[in-house]
Amino acid sequence: MNFRLLAALTSLSWACAAAPAPTTETAPLPPPSSAAQHLYAAAKNDILQVRSLLRSGRTQSSVGSGFLIGASNLVVTNYHVVSQFALDPDTYVGEWVDTSGQRGNVELLAVDVLHDLAVLCVNRSGTGFFKMPEPLARLAQGQYLYSLGNPLDLGFAISEGAYNGVIARSFYDQLMFTGPINAGMSGGPSVTVDGAVAGVNVSKRLDGELVSFLVPARFAQALLKQVATQTRPPADFTAVVTAQLLQHQRAMVDQLLATPLALKPMAPYRVPVRESEQMRCWGRSNVKADKPFAVDDANCSMESAIFVSGALQTGQISIRHQLLRATGLDQLRFAQLASASFRNENFGSNKDSRLTGPSCTEQFVRSQDVPLRAVLCVRAYRKFAGLYDFALLTASTDQPLISLQSRLDARGVSYENGLRLTRAFLAAFALEPKGGRP
């Protein structure tokens, strides 16, 4: 970043309306360590709570955190913190509250839905504590970071933890933070002991202890550069989010189809899967002596999705294969079992406010030497034009006592890319070579 642009980022001010309110009380919190205490004392004036309120009655709907950049009136936070008033500004409005209890309205300037970031404008300026200089701080695995925010709406707090590298399983880089990030801290900063911004608090795993994630500071820096060059905020953030989701699905599908799908044996078939850093596969066999059939499962899915709203996460692909084998059923009863399993699949309904009802077509096709019954269902996003959910369900028809049932789900893709995925998936099925694997 040149010095002129850096000055623009730290001094840029936007005109936005705000209204003061009385000081609010916060719950007492245990004292932090001396290093954390020093950081909090230096940074507390630049930490904000970001609230989403109903316009009617101004009752609180959701809360998160944010932080002022330099001496400007620009605030960095998470997209998911502001998503309600970004997508539905007629119903929701944003508000900031600082550590002294002062508050005011916010204006949304920019969003990055792919990295879960947003930039706001408020009617107060920072003290200059949080900066986004170039180059950014270099992190070493194991070094301590300090996360700031307002956990569970209990009061502003600071927590300590260790930086443990970049997570590759997410489609976009995230930093692993081995420390507590609780609800309400999303959008707050995580800093080094010197106060340099390392990342933005974003999420945590619910199935582990102290496994939390940060958005790398470089993505916030890029969004601030974008704000510095724009003359006014976008008039319609739904259109902005749509364009970013279309960008994501192009990259996602191109990466998935860059090489042929891998084939895994599920005798007597070979089934298409994709295993990568972003997409993991798991298998399971369910054979019980008291059951007249056996089931083998293989599931592959992306481990992350794009948060759009509290009711919608998208930009994700999953593959499932299920092999049913008769161990004590005749052909008629096994056919009934396999048909019931096929009919049990759910493709959604037309009562969904997010997507249209499924439009489905059914055909009998042949993939190499494997005859298949195939059902393709497509649903359009009501609010995000050009995006669709594709669901392809197949069942083998060549074995009287074996049924391979497979499903491909592609969420948040263009119509063209949905067809690309389904064609590649259908074309990949094959029979195991005679005499075993090659």
Can you annotate each of these PLM segments?
Residues 66-68, 106-108, 163, 280:
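Conserved hydrophobic positions within beta-strands
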Residues 1-38, 74, 362-363, 424-438:
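N-terminal targeting leaders that route proteins to membranes or the secretory/organellar pathways
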Residues 336-395:
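Signature of long, low-cysteine stretches enriched in small and polar/charged residues
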Residues 43-59, 123-131, 154-231:
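Active-site region of chymotrypsin-like
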Residues 21-67, 232-287:
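N-terminal activation segment of mature serine protease catalytic domains
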Residues 221, 231, 277-279, 400-438:
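Surface-exposed amphipathic alpha-helical segments
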Residues 248-362:
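Non-catalytic interaction/regulatory modules that flank or connect domains
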Residues 47, 70-148, 153-156, 171-174:
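Conserved active-site neighborhood of the chymotrypsin/trypsin-like protease fold
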